Amino acid sequence: MSDSQGNTINLDGIVLKAGGHTKRDAEALCVMEAVAWVAGEPHSDHPVCACPVIGAFLRQWNDSISTDEARTRLLKPLVPRLVGSKSTEAVEVRRSYLALDWLAREYAPAWLSLRNDLKAHAVALRGLAPLTDTASCAAAQTTLDAALAAAGAASRAAAGAAAG
């Protein structure tokens, strides 16, 4: 693979790391810094060529994966695909709603369903209409607020129990 200046870039040797890095080093890059490198851009975790919505999602995911091996295995294949992913504002708004919808109707319910006292909230979230615009988000707000409040209460109760 080559960057925009024709320099050869070998992604095989890259191990993705958590956090931001002050300089470009093939042995210490996060996923979005690798995208900037492949694109031939200055060192940054906010490459101009990449969709900012996808970039925000991937920076968070990059830093939440607990091992370099898992991070590299999951995220490195995405690096070449992210170069040139920046699009119009309308496309980026659509992508932001897709991410929000996934978070509210898939990700959160997966975790809530692990606790018997939160399963009803998981079911309610999964039953929401797709979150595609401000109107659909407003219609879902009561259900989202209830799930958040219940999860927060469960978290505080668990912390209190752990503290003794």
Each language-model region and where it sits:
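Short, glycine-biased loop/turn motifs at secondary-structure junctions and
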Residues: 1-164
